[in-house]
């Protein structure tokens, strides 16, 4: 299978988000990379589903709550920026304070 660097990056995000969701399902609190992976994955998939940048910026703040992450993780993530592919091209989605 031949993948471009961008496709490999997306595959890595999907794998990391899947692992994070499994740990979350076991009742574990998420660490920094796990939280970022889940938020990033949800934004990428939302763009693929045809949601707008504005919708995803708002949705990005509802994906995870403070209770779901380890102490201090929410403060470590002041924003998440995701370059996502929309039906009309690639756009940058910035989610400010994604974990509330």
From Swiss-Prot:
Stored Gene3D superfamilies: Urease, gamma-like subunit
GO cellular component entries: cytoplasm
Subcellular compartments: Cytoplasm
Catalytic activity, as annotated: urea + 2 H2O + H(+) = hydrogencarbonate + 2 NH4(+)
Stored Pfam families: Urease_gamma
Family annotation (InterPro entries): Urease_gamma, Urease_gamma/gamma-beta_su, Urease_gamma_sf, Urease_subunit
Family to which the UniProt record says this protein belongs: Belongs to the urease gamma subunit family.
HAMAP family linked to this entry: Urease_gamma
Protein name in the entry: Urease subunit gamma
Taxonomic lineage from the root: Bacteria, Pseudomonadati, Verrucomicrobiota, Opitutia, Opitutales
GN (gene name): ureA
């Amino acid at each position: 299978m031949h993948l471009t660097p961008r496709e490999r990056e997306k595959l890595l995000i999907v794998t990391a988000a899947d692992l994070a969701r499994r740990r979350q399902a076991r009742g574990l609190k998420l660490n920094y990379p796990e939280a970022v992976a889940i938020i990033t994955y949800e934004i990428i998939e939302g763009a693929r589903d045809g949601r707008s940048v504005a919708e995803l910026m708002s949705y990005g703040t509802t994906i995870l709550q403070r209770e779901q992450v380890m102490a201090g993780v929410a403060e470590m993530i002041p924003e998440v920026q995701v370059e996502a592919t929309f039906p009309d091209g690639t756009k940058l989605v910035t989610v400010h304070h994604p974990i509330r």
